[in-house]
Amino acid sequence: MVIVSITNQLKKELQESNFSPLFLENCLNSKFLSIKQNDKKIIGACFVGGTFNSNGIEIIKEFQGMGLGKKLLDEIISECQKRKISFLMGVFKPTNKISIKTHTKIGYRLLFTIFYNHQEGKEIVVILPFNLQGKFLAKFLKFFDTRIGNLIFAILFSLSQPFIKGLIAFDSQSMSKFDFGYAVSHYEKVSQTLSNIDKFN
């Protein structure tokens, strides 16, 4: 595992990997990454990017199930602490129970559920605070787990689309379109989201 910053050479290596287009976009716009190579090819990466320190991990399919994700994340957490970064944020699909459990064991807090659009369905926003500032932010963001808070988040997220790349290291033009109507017409607390998933597993 190694921490790297984005260079032209790294961009080329990432583009030659088999990462999903969405994850690749995040990596290319990140502040720094932790990567794992095999035979000089990148087989796993974990990125941090944007004002909100957006964080995500992807491992090439044939190398999944080997514990690489946790090792990459541990490397990122160590680097964040060295750089005095206050928190990491991420988004999970509720159906990805293994990833949710892994991240909550590390210290990630589940903040709220947002209904993105008909195709993407609902997503869970999470945060990993490192210090008092991060913990304060986590408490503040829990407001979005309320009905009125969820509505306000949907409004803010809709208005922030032109600035998304700077906020979460992802170009809004490449994102699936956020459906404001769908978001405000659906709501459930994050605890209910997890409970619903458990019923079907």
Language-model regions, residue ranges each:
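Short amphipathic alpha-helix that is part of the acyltransferase structural core
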Residues: 1-26, 139-143, 150, 154, ...
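Conserved acetyl-CoA-binding loop-helix of GNAT-fold acetyltransferases
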Residues: 59, 65-78, 105
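Conserved GNAT acetyl-CoA-binding A-motif
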Residues: 80-94
